[in-house]
């Protein structure tokens, strides 16, 4: 059964409808993307969801609609998150003030994206696949962060003791498999 959501005054909005039908700009619906987020969080313990919007020269919302410029979702698993930092606000709440992740990687280079409250920077790092890579990094793009916050949400399966590391369901499955194996071994010994 698909979830039901109340979008309030945005119900029927063209950009919202487009987003719900193609949430990741790769043809997958919002429900499908969120199902993948849930599955990855279950496997890894957590995963990151980043909401971004392409840079545009559109001056009005009508121009954005005509060019199909709208927010989209990207999913990053823990092995893609290289570094992060949380700070405590004056109210006592923790907030993310830096996130560094591997956006793309191949044999020759990696694309690293660094989110801060002030900027979003994209670097190309050569020879990234080597352990303790000493490859040169080159700034490809640095744009101001228009919202002043990092547009990322850490989705937990179960919260762990350390921020932002979650607890995977696979650990429970491993214990269950071990128990089943031990039970079968005991039964086999009783039969002999």
Where are these regions (language model features)?
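Extended, charged amphipathic alpha-helical segments
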Residues: 134-192
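Extended, non-transmembrane interaction/recognition domains
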Residues: 107, 113-149
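A general structural signal for short secondary-structure junctions and capping/turn motifs
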Residues: 38-43, 87-92, 188-191
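Generic structural signal of hydrophobic/aromatic residues within well-ordered alpha-helices
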Residues: 16-23, 30-33, 38, 99, ...
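Short, flexible loop/turn elements at secondary-structure junctions
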Residues: 53-55, 100-105, 184
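Glycine-rich, Trp-frequent "lid" loop and neighboring beta-strands that shape
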Residues: 65-113, 117
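Extended, helix-rich architectural segments
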Residues: 1-76
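A short, compositionally biased
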Residues: 36, 42-52, 93-96, 105-109, ...
């Amino acid at each position: 059964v698909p979830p039901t959501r109340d979008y309030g005054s945005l119900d029927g909005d063209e950009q919202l409808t487009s987003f719900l039908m193609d949430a990741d700009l790769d043809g997958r619906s919002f429900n499908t993307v969120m199902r993948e987020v849930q599955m990855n969080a279950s496997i890894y313990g957590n995963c990151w969801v980043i909401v971004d919007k392409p840079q545009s020269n559109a001056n009005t919302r009508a121009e954005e609609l005509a060019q199909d410029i709208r927010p989209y979702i990207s999913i990053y698993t823990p092995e893609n998150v290289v570094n992060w930092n949380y700070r405590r606000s004056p109210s006592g709440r923790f907030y993310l003030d830096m996130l560094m992740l591997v956006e793309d990687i191949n044999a020759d280079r990696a694309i690293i994206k660094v989110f801060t409250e002030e900027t979003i920077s994209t670097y190309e790092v050569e020879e990234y696949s080597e352990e303790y890579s000493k490859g040169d990094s080159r700034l490809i793009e640095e744009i101001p962060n228009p919202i002043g916050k990092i547009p990322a949400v850490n989705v937990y399966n179960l919260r762990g003791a350390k921020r932002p590391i979650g607890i995977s369901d696979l650990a429970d499955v491993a214990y269950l498999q071990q128990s089943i194996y031990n039970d079968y071994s005991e039964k086999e010994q009783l039969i002999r």
